[in-house]
From Swiss-Prot:
<feature type="short sequence motif" description="'HIGH' region">
    <location>
        <begin position="43"/>
        <end position="54"/>
    </location>
</feature>
<keyword id="KW-0963">Cytoplasm</keyword>
<keyword id="KW-0648">Protein biosynthesis</keyword>
<dbReference type="GO" id="GO:0002161">
    <property type="term" value="F:aminoacyl-tRNA deacylase activity"/>
</dbReference>
<dbReference type="InterPro" id="IPR013155">
    <property type="entry name" value="M/V/L/I-tRNA-synth_anticd-bd"/>
</dbReference>
<dbReference type="InterPro" id="IPR002302">
    <property type="entry name" value="Leu-tRNA-ligase"/>
</dbReference>
<keyword id="KW-0030">Aminoacyl-tRNA synthetase</keyword>
<comment type="similarity">
    <text>Belongs to the class-I aminoacyl-tRNA synthetase family.</text>
</comment>
<dbReference type="InterPro" id="IPR015413">
    <property type="entry name" value="Methionyl/Leucyl_tRNA_Synth"/>
</dbReference>
<dbReference type="InterPro" id="IPR009008">
    <property type="entry name" value="Val/Leu/Ile-tRNA-synth_edit"/>
</dbReference>
<dbReference type="Pfam" id="PF13603">
    <property type="entry name" value="tRNA-synt_1_2"/>
</dbReference>
<dbReference type="GO" id="GO:0006429">
    <property type="term" value="P:leucyl-tRNA aminoacylation"/>
</dbReference>
<keyword id="KW-0067">ATP-binding</keyword>
<feature type="short sequence motif" description="'KMSKS' region">
    <location>
        <begin position="634"/>
        <end position="638"/>
    </location>
</feature>
<keyword id="KW-0436">Ligase</keyword>
<dbReference type="InterPro" id="IPR014729">
    <property type="entry name" value="Rossmann-like_a/b/a_fold"/>
</dbReference>
<dbReference type="Pfam" id="PF08264">
    <property type="entry name" value="Anticodon_1"/>
</dbReference>
Length: 878
């Protein structure tokens, strides 16, 4: 009989479900070190369903969880759905269905597909962020932020997506476009709710060092937080040069990390949104400045700071004085300066900053050299009597020049001295700033958590009492976004108008909704206690499971979900609601599973159905006959190269798909899908099935194959073969144990393939002992659980293999036959030699002396002492 994978998978998935095999509780018999919370980043349920890339991370965590259970761990492994947000709402708008209906249907599809892989999730803990019983606690947690002063209302220029008709956080903008729909983002002033994530910037930065995360992700967060140590410097306004204005500031404050270049400032640049622009602008320059400010308002931050674009600006007509030397310098407006960073004003040092150089070159402004690689008394400048000698900007540090009493100091020393001088005069002060901006926490859309606040004419903003939660989304047929930035909830008149919770007068509800990230900031906590109606999570359950021991998901969430969740968690920690400072102890980013695509000479990719293979085996365009290059690309509906897991499971089975996805390469690496590789893995499982049949047919086989070889030569050869196979099994167990612990699944599978090939060869000549076979089935079970359960039952067992103890290795069988010993002379490697394990020190020293390297570097000298590390090292100290 062939390998009946369809019947096996249906049988064992029903068994796991009906027997509640993977439902877990807070069993106190497991000590803290034997508890593990393993989590996948939960999916948002798109209409397209899963493609074969989605289950990669899910398969990895499932293998790891099954391995831990067999190792005696109590494992929490849940799954749910990130169901609120723009993707779900945009699909509903496109299809004309209500998002509640379409999202529910999409969740059903995702659940069916995920379950078809046989993942060992505790489905009784399933959550959905769009479930009122869930978002009740999202609203409750938001109110905690509000009470703590971390949520506030503001009208400010934000990233606006004209297609999605909503504001976007900086983290949701990619290359000046909306991350979700790809539309070009503009700037727009909209009333928003903001969350003060900047209050936690330093802790978010410093605590990264404690996390077992990929260094690349930690560095992305460090860069996004963008800590900068510098100084704020006040430039007095030269009042006579400015137009008369009742709000004329006395000084313009700038932030700089290069106070050592203060003598080289030749102009100031204000962001177009800077509050002093109007007051500083002279009458003669007013029209030009106003026109420039209006043009700048249409650009997003990425456009404005693009180094490749030509700098633009306009002179205000105003001047300020340099506080270090009283030089009179002009004030310009330039959109390459952002009001959201530093003070919204920069001191321009074109000789030592490339952006300032480009700006000065464009507008003919002077460039003063004040830092030199080698100190000399004077260095000519572009406006010096010697003429224009500067050919390029030099941003490196060095020694300050043309800087009065500070000449000759190294840049770092000059910074300290100049800032101290300014502080003494009250013209400056040291300051730490961060690139991180407060989080835009509201969306002008329908499908999200309603914000539980009321606007009262008398009382202002009033939070809803806890008894009024959850504040439900109103049922409405018209959920299309508006153009005025108010949001669809403003049209729900009955829902909108409500008595003020504080004074009972007429009030209106907040019409913005929360962003998709709100529900995903804390979902890992709800899994610990998903049915609790009196708290988001009981403290004793949080203490039992926290923190998440292993979190697996995409690196694209580095400065979105992962940063937001860390911030949210730290707030909860400060409120005494969680017991750990960080939510995720270890993070692993799985690589992307890509697909093959075909590229024309002009770089355009061609859909699969337009590609043919000619008689020479070359890929050609079906219509034009043009030769095509086969490349690796992201799976795309447009390219028609998306691989549906339903089709693969139907043809080859869930176990084959699981094993193949892990066998493709290292978990963290991107790799292309190749169905022929899946066929190869399917044949591997078929081979195991055939081998199992041989074992089952050999009833009454001896359980101990380790007896001494008998005298009969033929029997002796058979016994030696079995001994060698058992040795290979123990080495396989060791390899699979080590690699599964390290999430190196591809090499574990390779080792199992080696064992199966050898076991198949041996089994043709003699029966395999059932004890040996059962040990192999155990290590196979995390990888191919359906097949392993059936093989376990064939061995005569009536209970699941899922909680069987992981097989132990016989140390004698895995010890190396020889050791490689390093020979050093005075700590430097000079040679190596091989020796039997645990050789005595006398033998190690003698063999080391006999090596060519030792003879060359010792010569006739006698070492003062010999340092020996058994099995590893001999070091001669002269």
């Amino acid at each position: 009989m062939g390998y009946p994978f369809r019947a096996l998978e249906k049988k064992w998935q029903a068994y796991w479900r009906d027997k509640r095999v993977f439902c877990v509780s807070e069993d106190e018999r497991f000590p803290p070190e034997r508890r593990a919370y393993v989590l996948d980043m939960f999916p948002y349920p798109s209409a397209q369903g899963l493609h074969v890339g989605h289950p990669e991370g899910y398969t990895a965590t499932d293998i790891y969880c099954r391995y831990l259970r067999m190792g005696g761990y109590n494992v929490l492994h849940p799954m749910g759905f990130d169901a609120f947000g723009l993707p779900a709402e945009n699909f509903a708008l496109k299809t004309g269905t209500h998002p509640r209906v379409s999202t529910s249907a999409n969740c059903d599809t995702f659940r069916r597909q995920i379950q078809s892989f046989g993942f060992s999730y505790d489905w009784e803990r399933e959550i959905s962020t769009a479930d009122p019983e869930y978002y009740r606690w999202t609203q409750w947690l938001f109110l905690k932020l509000y009470e703590k002063g971390l949520a506030y209302e503001a009208t400010a220029p934000i990233n606006w997506c004209p297609s999605c008709k909503t504001g976007l956080a900086n983290e949701e903008v990619r290359d000046a476009c909306c991350e979700r729909c790809g539309a070009e983002v503009t700037r727009r002033g909209v009333r928003q709710w903001m969350v003060r994530i900047t209050a936690y910037a330093e802790r978010l930065l410093s605590d990264l060092d404690e996390l077992d995360w990929p260094e690349s992700v930690k560095q992305m967060q460090r860069n996004w937080i963008g800590k900068s140590c510098g100084a704020e410097i006040d430039f007095p306004v030269d009042a006579p040069a400015c137009s008369v204005h009742d709000k004329l500031p006395q000084t313009i404050r700038v932030y700089t990390t290069r106070a050592d270049t203060l003598f080289g400032v030749t102009y100031l640049v204000l962001a177009p949104e800077h509050e002093a622009v109007t007051a500083l602008t002279t009458h003669a320059q007013r029209a030009a400045v106003q026109a420039y400010v209006q043009r700048a308002a249409k650009k997003n931050d990425l456009e404005r700071t693009d180094l490749a674009k030509e700098k633009t600006g306009v002179f205000t007509g105003a001047y300020v004085r340099n506080p270090i030397n009283d030089m009179r310098i002009p004030v310009w407006v330039g959109d390459y300066v952002l009001v959201s960073y530093g003070t919204g004003a920069v001191m321009a040092v074109p000789a030592h900053d490339q952006r300032d150089w480009d700006f000065a070159t464009r507008f003919g402004l002077p460039k003063l050299t004040v830092v030199s690689a080698d100190y000399t008394a004077t260095v000519p400048n572009s406006n010096s009597p010697q003429g224009a000698v500067l050919q390029r900007c030099v941003s490196d540090e060095g020694f300050v020049v043309n800087s009065g009493a500070f000449n000759g100091l190294a840049s770092a020393d000059a910074r300290e001295r100049i800032v101290a001088h300014l502080e003494m005069r009250g013209a400056g002060a040291r300051r730490v700033t961060y690139r991180l901006r407060d989080w835009v926490f509201s969306r002008q859309r329908y499908w999200g958590e309603p914000i539980p606040l009321v606007h009262c004419p008398s009382c202002g903003v009033v939070p809803l009492p806890e008894s009024a939660l959850p504040l439900l989304l109103p049922e409405t047929a018209d959920f299309t976004p508006t153009e005025d930035g108010q949001g669809p909830l403003a049209r729900a008149r009955t829902w909108l108008r409500v008595p003020c919770p504080q004074c009972a007068s007429d009030a209106v509800r907040e019409t913005n909704t929360m962003p998709q990230w709100a529900g995903s900031c804390w979902y890992y906590l709800r899994y610990m206690d998903p049915r609790n109606k009196t708290a988001f999570c009981a403290p004793e359950k949080e203490r039992y499971w926290a923190p998440v021991a292993l979190y697996v998901g995409g690196a694209e969430h580095a400065v979105l979900h992962l940063l937001y969740a860390r911030f949210w968690h730290k707030v909860l920690y400060d409120l005494g609601l969680v017991s750990t400072k960080e939510p995720f102890a270890r993070l692993v980013n799985q690589g992307m599973i890509t697909s093959y695509a075909y590229r024309r000479k002009n770089g355009a990719l061609v859909p699969h159905d337009e590609v043919h293979t000619n008689a020479q085996g070359t890929y050609v365009h079906a219509r034009t006959g043009e030769k095509l290059e086969c490349v690796v690309a992201k799976m795309s509906k447009a390219l028609k190269n998306v691989v549906n897991p339903d089709d693969m499971i139907a043809a080859y089975g869930a176990d084959a798909c699981r094993v193949y996805e892990m066998f493709m390469g290292p978990l963290e690496a991107s790799k292309p899908w190749n169905t022929q590789g899946l066929v190869g893995v399917f044949r591997f499982l078929e081979k195991i099935w055939v081998l199992a049949g041989r074992v089952a047919a050999a009833n009454g086989i001896p359980q101990d194959s380790r007896a001494e070889p008998p005298g009969d030569l033929h029997a002796q050869k058979k016994s030696c073969s079995m001994y060698a196979l058992e040795t290979l099994l123990h080495r396989t167990i060791q390899k699979v144990t080590d690699d599964t612990s390290a999430l190196s699944f591809n090499t574990a599978i390779s080792q199992m393939m080696i064992f199966v090939n050898e076991a198949t060869r041996v089994a043709r000549r003699m029966p395999l002992p059932s004890k040996m076979w059962e040990m192999f089935v155990k290590i196979l079970s995390p990888y191919a659980p359906h097949l392993a359960e059936e093989l376990w039952e064939m061995c005569g067992h009536t209970h699941t293999i899922a909680y069987e103890p992981w097989p132990q290795v016989d140390p004698a069988r895995v010890a190396p036959h020889v050791c490689s010993v390093v020979v050093q002379v005075n700590g430097k490697v000079r040679d190596t030699f091989s020796v039997a394990p645990n050789a005595p020190n006398e033998e190690l020293e003698q063999k080391a002396r006999e090596t060519a390297g030792a003879r060359k570097f010792l010569g006739t000298q006698q070492p003062k002492r010999v340092v020996i590390v058994p099995n590893k090292l001999v070091n001669f100290v002269l």
